[in-house]
Curated annotation (Swiss-Prot):
Involved in the insertion of nickel into the carbon monoxide dehydrogenase (CODH). Pfam families: CbiA (PF01656). ATP binds at residues 7-14. GO terms for cellular component: cytoplasmic side of plasma membrane; cytosol; membrane. This is Carbon monoxide dehydrogenase accessory protein CooC. Keywords: ATP-binding, Nickel, Nucleotide-binding. GO terms for molecular function: ATP binding; ATP hydrolysis activity; GTPase activity. PANTHER family: SEPTUM SITE-DETERMINING PROTEIN MIND HOMOLOG, CHLOROPLASTIC, SEPTUM SITE-DETERMINING PROTEIN MIND HOMOLOG, CHLOROPLASTIC-RELATED. It comes from Rhodospirillum rubrum. GO terms for biological process: negative regulation of cell division; nickel incorporation into metallo-sulfur cluster. The keyword Secreted does not apply. CDD domains: CooC1. InterPro entries: CobQ/CobB/MinD/ParA_Nub-bd_dom (IPR002586), CooC (IPR014433), P-loop_NTPase (IPR027417), ParA/MinD_ATPase (IPR050625).
Length: 263
């Protein structure tokens, strides 16, 4: 089961991926969580202690590894391997916590839309390998878009979850992401409404329910905010968050069905 989570910046993607990863792990799933957001907040959302991550770099920042695997060098210029070996990277660089394998993937910024560099080749090949070859349940915390995916990879995504909040800009971003995702061939797309702080917020979402397929919602919870401020996982601090995580997990499994990844 391969699930990508995206949405406008600041809507709470990392928190939701962390909650789902912990719930799935507690239910016996073998889970790999990939942080492909440049802000890289997924570790604390899962509950990984900060001191365990201080020496780690995202794969996208490992220039030496990218050059080693692609054969790139200052003398080769733009000539390097576009499909490098990556099958051993998860075992080398994943951090294990609460039964979850966390991989800091990161992103690669380009000056031009057609730019391909060794780091980009490594990250894209690694993501394709994980989505098409690995047997775990994979959760990907993404930036606001699906730029990581190409047409050779996109069909491996079982479900795209777009996180929204009660605001017009959030819904505009969600609509843009959904349009691109459908153009690329993702068939199953749903939404989670986050940060619903009042009946007005709930009404805002329900009044527009015909615009999206709502998987579930998360009310505003001060425990989530407190966990974020402390760099901890709300799953560890709040029974209400754990209950909500398991409810979302159950709704998610109804959409895609248990396929692979159960221990």
């Amino acid at each position: 089961m391969k699930i990508a989570v995206t949405g406008k910046g600041g809507v709470g993607k990392s928190t939701i991926v962390g909650m789902l990863a912990r719930a799935l792990s507690d239910e016996g799933w073998r889970v790999m969580a990939i942080d492909a957001d440049p802000d890289a907040n997924l570790a604390s959302a899962i509950g990984v202690p900060a001191e365990r991550l201080s020496a780690l770099l995202p794969i996208s920042k490992m220039t030496g590894l990218a050059r080693e695997r692609t054969g790139a060098s200052e003398t080769t210029g733009t000539h390097f391997i576009l499909n490098p070996r990556v099958d051993d990277i998860p075992e080398q660089f994943c951090v294990d916590h609460a039964g979850i394998k966390l991989l800091l993937m990161g992103t690669v910024n380009h000056a031009g839309s057609g730019c391909v560099c060794p780091e980009h080749a490594l990250v894209r090949t690694l993501l394709r390998h994980i989505l098409t070859k690995r047997k775990e349940c994979v959760l990907i915390d993404m930036e606001a878009g699906i730029e990581h995916f190409g047409r050779g990879t996109i069909e491996a995504v079982d479900l795209l979850v777009i996180v929204i909040e009660p605001g017009s800009r959030s819904l505009q971003t969600a609509a843009q992401i959904e349009g691109l995702a459908r153009d690329l061939g993702i068939k199953t797309i749903c939404h989670i409404a986050n940060k619903l702080a009042s009946p007005v917020d709930v009404g805002f979402i329900l009044d527009r329910a015909d615009q999206f397929d709502l998987l579930g919602s998360i009310p505003f919870d001060s425990a989530i905010q407190a966990a974020d401020q402390a760099g901890l996982s709300c799953y560890d601090l709040s029974p209400a968050c754990r209950d909500k995580a398991h409810a979302l997990m159950a709704a998610l499994l109804e959409r895609v069905g248990p396929t692979q990844g159960v221990s």
